[in-house]
């Protein structure tokens, strides 16, 4: 049985990556910052896999800010799926967040090298492949974000710098690296404690007074987890970046999906002037990342993942609907 290490097990994406690999017959060991969090994580994962598959999951305590416990726990694995990354809280400086993100990535990659594990699949972000907001381009994996772009927030800059650092380290140390670049990650949550990026959908589901014109390139978390496994298993993916979102819905279009499927919510769709989002983003952290996306016209292509790996995606309408159904089922929408 092959074994993979998944970093940041308590995260929204990492949880689904764990489920994906367990269901495919892998042994999975995942890092958590505190072993006190394993009870909750076990319950989340157990709800999505069989009892037999659950027996192949283990945990170890490790933090991206420290070298402690990484090497000995990675040793003997067939590969590392590096998902963990700091999101930031909107208050850090560029330097602070970039340093934490880069150092965390290099901590894991250096531990993999010392443990003799060459294969690494890393979660990056479309933030590392973003043009200026007025661009109308169709972008593929060859495009890298210009960190001098004034539209970029510290989080986006940190994703660019940490991915570049990963590629540099991989080239210098003969690691077999693949990076995955998702867009706005939505989909069913595994528990009411893991809302994560679905917080945006929760606001739309509960009705926003006005909706900014923000087109979102959507990555279904289930498809994203599947892409990590496909990339890990396919030697053709070594040395490549893969974009993981190409289908777009505006926030108003998401509201329309909810208006149709949940009429009792009495959702009203009102377009907001751009300046209202800019003001609201000062007080609501999850809205800050949306400001550079106002009225954007550029988009990405996922042809590489489709052609190389046979990857497919849910329709974005199904993604946001499935996410909402789970939010409602778990009572998070109240």
PLM feature spans:
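Glycine/proline-rich active-site loop of Rossmann-fold NAD(P)-dependent oxidoreductases
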Residues: 172-175, 187-198, 230-241
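Conserved C-terminal active-site "lid" loop/helix of NAD(P)H-dependent oxidoreductases
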Residues: 280-312
């Amino acid at each position: 049985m092959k074994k993979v290490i998944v970093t940041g097990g308590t995260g929204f994406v990492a949880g689904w990556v764990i489920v994906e690999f367990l269901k495919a017959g892998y042994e999975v060991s995942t890092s958590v910052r505190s072993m006190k969090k394993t009870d909750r994580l076990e319950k989340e994962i157990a709800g999505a896999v069989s009892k037999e598959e659950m027996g192949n999951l283990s945990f170890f305590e490790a933090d991206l800010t420290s070298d402690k416990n990484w090497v000995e726990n990675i040793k003997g694995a067939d590969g590392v799926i590096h998902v963990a990354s700091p999101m930031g809280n909107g208050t850090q400086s560029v330097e602070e967040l970039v340093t934490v993100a880069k150092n965390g990535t290099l901590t894991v990659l250096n531990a993999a090298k010392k443990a003799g594990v060459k294969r690494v699949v890393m979660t990056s972000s479309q933030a590392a492949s973003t043009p200026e907001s007025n661009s109308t381009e169709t972008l593929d994996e060859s495009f890298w974000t210009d960190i001098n772009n004034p539209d970029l927030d510290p989080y986006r800059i940190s994703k660019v710098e940490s991915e570049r650092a990963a590629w540099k380290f991989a080239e210098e140390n003969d690691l077999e690296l693949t990076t995955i670049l998702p867009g706005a990650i939505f989909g069913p949550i595994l528990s009411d404690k893991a809302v994560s990026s679905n917080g945006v959908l929760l606001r739309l589901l509960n009705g926003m007074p006005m909706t900014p014109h923000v087109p979102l390139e959507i990555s279904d978390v289930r498809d994203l987890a599947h892409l990590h496994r496909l990339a890990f298993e396919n030697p053709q993916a070594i040395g490549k970046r893969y974009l993981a979102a190409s289908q777009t819905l505006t926030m108003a279009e998401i509201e329309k999906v909810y208006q149709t499927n949940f009429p009792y919510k009495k959702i009203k769709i009102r377009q907001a002037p751009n300046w209202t989002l800019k003001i609201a983003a000062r007080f609501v952290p999850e809205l800050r990342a949306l400001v550079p996306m106002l009225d954007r016209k550029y988009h990405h292509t996922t042809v590489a993942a489709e052609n190389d790996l046979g990857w497919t995606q849910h329709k974005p309408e199904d993604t946001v609907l499935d996410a909402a159904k789970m939010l409602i089922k778990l009572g998070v929408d109240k």
